[in-house]
Amino acid sequence: MSDSLWHLYLLRTASGMLYTGITTDVARRLAQHQAGKGAKALRGKGELTLVFHCEAGDRSTALKLEYRVKQLSKQQKEKLVIDQPRLLTTLFLDS
């Protein structure tokens, strides 16, 4: 089991769609997506732009956070892009 620090990221496609994902290396994952070796949802979508990323803790926390962000409306995701909060865990996972 690895203690790697995970990150949550949002990519914007050429058509304006926002894609949410998690990784231990944002630059590597973005390069994979841009090379067509990432998620099928992004293949053939044109240029991809990293518009948001933040630390998400361990893998378990990152997966929970990814799920919560994927449940947000496009408008709420756009607010994340504008506000650029450093930590989302306090917004979404603290009860």
From Swiss-Prot:
It holds the Pfam family GIY-YIG. InterPro entries: GIY-YIG_endonuc, GIY-YIG_endonuc_sf, UPF0213_domain, UPF0213_GIY-YIG_endonuc. Residues 4-79 form the GIY-YIG domain. Belongs to the UPF0213 family. This is UPF0213 protein YPO3475/y0709/YP_0608.
